[in-house]
Amino acid sequence: MTEKYLSVYRKKVPAIDNEIEVYTRPVVDLQMRLGLMDRFPDVLQILTVAKVPLEKFVGPKDAVELARIANDELAELLVKYPNKFFGAAACLPMNDIDATLEEADRAIGKLGLQGVQIYSRIAGEPLDLPKFKPLYEKMAGYNLPIWLHPETNPALDMDRGIFSWPYETTAAMLRLVQSGIFYEYPALKFIVHHAGAMVPFFADRLKWFASATKLFTQNDPKIYEQFLNFYVDTALYGNTPALQCAYEYYGAGHILFGTDAPLGPRWGMIEGTIRSIERMAITEAEKEKIFSGNAIELFKMAL
């Protein structure tokens, strides 16, 4: 959370402190974060605003103001620390879709950010509602990704996200596939966390349900293949067998190096995640794609 963004957010919604108190200090302390990053000089980060969706706490007017502040600060950090931060995903005021489209244009076209971030539900509403389609059309036009972060589900979060977040991610992926959005916008790209959540593990189950039931509304017996449009990260706390499962499903070309830093144990398990990729039974060229090549191509960046 950037400095001015958090300061303004706190004034508008004092309860925000209850949400961020479980986070580690590097989420809000830039100098501590930079110091920790010095331990991994070969690792660059893509910045996103920490998980407190604007639409969850503030109305549309305040959400627009806060999103603009956050994105301005993200862009400033990219300029100030080019050897630390590789890019950033824009924060959006999703409770005002017209303002969301304007801010996406400003963040990408003017500020030079590399995509946008949304959540698995928008103020409790699913992502396949028609009112969100203009954002998907816009991002497909930019050929830049949408980061999809799981939202908190009060009915499931007694585990503080251990299993509820992968479920939230998977449910959102399913609704997007069922909606046929990837048929409509073939260039649309989503990045989901935790190696694709439940999808790789249940790949054959998905295939069976798609062919044998009416779960999928699109008239395509191979609609399950649309799950392969997602990109996934490696944030599994160093679990090589799970990464291998994701690789067997997605292939190396849709896996991006990612951790929970600056959250999680040992500062996001950066070292453990690196080791887990190095232990995978894949070629060195494929490992290089996961570590950096896919990101460079997807975000249209150069090191």
Question: What residues fall within each predicted segment?
Answer:
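Acidic-and-aromatic substrate-binding clefts and catalytic sites of carbohydrate-active enzymes
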Residues: 23-28, 55, 93-100, 123-130, ...
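H/E-rich (His + Asp/Glu) clusters that bind or coordinate divalent metals
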Residues: 157-177, 189, 194-303
